[in-house]
Design a protein with these regions (language model features):
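S-adenosyl-L-methionine
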Residues: 45-88
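Conserved SAM-binding loop of SAM-dependent methyltransferases across substrates and taxa
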Residues: 22-35
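SAM-dependent Rossmann-like transferase core, predominantly class I methyltransferases
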Residues: 1-13
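C-terminal catalytic and target-recognition region of SAM-dependent MTase-like enzymes
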Residues: 110, 124-189
């Protein structure tokens, strides 16, 4: 569902997929015609499966994977002057309880700030939170704060929640857990 949403923006694009796990966003970018895709994840096992998935889909020539900690890699890529047409941030839940929301906000702010720095002017950022405790307002505020910190303007292209097979039950707040944005990133002048 959300993986399909990025496809229309990936034709001929250079894509960075952070927290790729088994590569589903990266593979969808490759299928959509991205010129190159780099998927990054800290799990060696997940990266091995992602590489197999790329091979099974005939994408090994354009979609590659790296077993690295995203928080450590993004500053290195920035220092090297790397820029991407699209950066995808799909981290695991940074909080699974109300007591750790403050630390989660720091993590989401940092990862979004780093991701925005790597997007070419006019490129795209897809960013997600799969934590129920990181509600819509707080996630949105955190992204806006990251954008101010790096002096970029965000133009919201799309907002989604989880796919229809994970319905949101109004009587169960915890069922509204996924927030998924696509932004166009514009440098402020």
């Amino acid at each position: 569902y959300n993986r399909l949403a990025i496809q229309r923006l990936c034709k001929d694009a250079k894509v960075l997929d952070c927290f790729t796990h088994t590569g589903s966003f990266a593979l969808n970018a490759g299928i959509a015609g991205a010129s190159s895709v780099l998927g990054v994840d800290a799990s060696e096992l997940a990266i091995k499966q992602a590489e197999k998935n790329a091979e099974l889909n005939g994408l090994s020539d354009r979609v590659r994977f790296m077993n690295r900690d995203v928080f450590a890699l993004l500053p290195e890529l920035e220092k090297q002057g790397e820029k991407f047409d699209m950066v995808i941030l799909d981290p695991p839940a940074f909080t699974k309880s109300r007591s750790s929301v403050k630390n989660a906000v720091k993590g989401y702010r940092e990862i979004n700030l780093r991701g925005m720095k790597l997007v070419k002017d006019g490129g795209f950022l897809a960013t997600c939170s799969c934590s129920h405790f990181m509600d819509y307002e707080l996630f949105t505020k955190t992204i806006a704060q990251a954008a101010r910190n790096v002096h970029v303007r965000l133009r919201q292209v799309e907002f989604r929640t989880q796919s229809p097979d994970h319905p949101i039950l109004w009587a169960a707040d915890e069922s509204y857990y996924l927030k998924f944005y696509i932004f166009q990133v514009c440098r402020e002048y």
